[in-house]
């Protein structure tokens, strides 16, 4: 294997040289997806002006149809993918442009997806970011108030303690797993719970899907915001983010597992 890596027999194509994938011809998967996600919405979004950043990725094909199917006045940006410009200076990993749009005062909320659209981050009308912990907290509380929450919420060891405090104040249990959506989903299934996710905006709403779906997350949050009747900034402030820092600690492979099991490390 090492010899193959050092001296590959042929040149491997990368980036834009790989080529393109043609659209599926057997039916209309875009329309089917839009119908599915729109069908999960508990309300219409009529009158809600939304800025949407598609990261020049997967949601470019669906976001406009989805938000307008729900009645939202959606302004779609970064939805011209060419196979190379995905996530370039846009999307949930580069929120600066969306934040500037929100500060203009013309939008109620901004939604940013990543390239494959499994994550969603939100920006309120003041330009402040609403990360995955805040989104999950508001949704879990809204679900409980409407009799939709099954048990509690699942986060990870990187979930901000502010979310723990927010949920505990509302008698909503929260469990933490290792980082990764597979561990979040495993815990959700084991407990029979229906919401979990990560600070990055990767949320699993298992009543509708078994993996993260940024557009589904956005639709559920926007409906919650509309039904609650409060602006995004007020909802954002409900979940206080505690000071937090993440540090990568180097360790030999032989001892990584043992180190990860130490109570002192787990608690940090």
Q: What is each residue range found by the language model?
A:
Residues 71-78, 129-134, 171-179:
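Short hydrophobic/aromatic-enriched beta-strand-loop microsegments
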Residues 52-55, 113-115, 197, 206:
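Active-site flanking residues adjacent to catalytic metal/cofactor-binding acidic residues
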